[in-house]
Curated annotation (Swiss-Prot):
This is Large ribosomal subunit protein uL14. One of its GO terms (cellular component) is cytosolic large ribosomal subunit. GO terms for biological process: translation. GO terms for molecular function: large ribosomal subunit rRNA binding; structural constituent of ribosome. The lineage of its organism: Bacteria, Pseudomonadati, Pseudomonadota, Gammaproteobacteria, Alteromonadales. The gene is rplN.
Length: 122
């Protein structure tokens, strides 16, 4: 569960290393974001020659959470970190590579580009 002020790692090669959630999109009083939800983020740490700079505000999709996701068959998948993938204005990934596993729930959310770039889909 990601909320305002949550710090997330970045799971792509857009140049950002660490971001902070500044808004959970989808409703005026929505508090938490789960895997597959879109959030607004501020870049807190970035690599020198990346596509994004420190202080930039971007859209991102949550791909891994410590809280995890519960499936209809009763199984649950949790991760060791909270991670997001940076998106542009058209909700397409900024980076060209995705690092680490992503879940099948992203396939339902129309993020097939992220699913196809990911090295592992759980």
């Amino acid at each position: 569960m990601i909320q305002m002020q949550s710090q997330l790692n970045v799971a792509d090669n857009s140049g950002a290393k660490r971001v902070q959630c500044i808004k959970v999109l989808g409703g005026s009083h929505r508090r938490y974001a789960r895997i597959g939800d879109i959030i607004k983020v501020a870049v807190k740490e970035a690599s020198p020659r990346g596509k994004v700079k420190k202080g930039d505000v971007h859209t991102a999709v949550v791909v891994r959470t410590k809280k995890g996701v519960r499936r209809t068959d009763g199984s649950a998948i949790r991760f060791d970190e909270n991670a997001a993938v940076m998106l542009n204005a058209n909700l397409q990934p900024i980076g060209t590579r995705i690092f680490g596993p992503v879940t099948r729930e992203l396939r339902n959310e129309k993020f097939m580009k992220i699913v196809s770039l990911a090295p592992e889909v759980l």
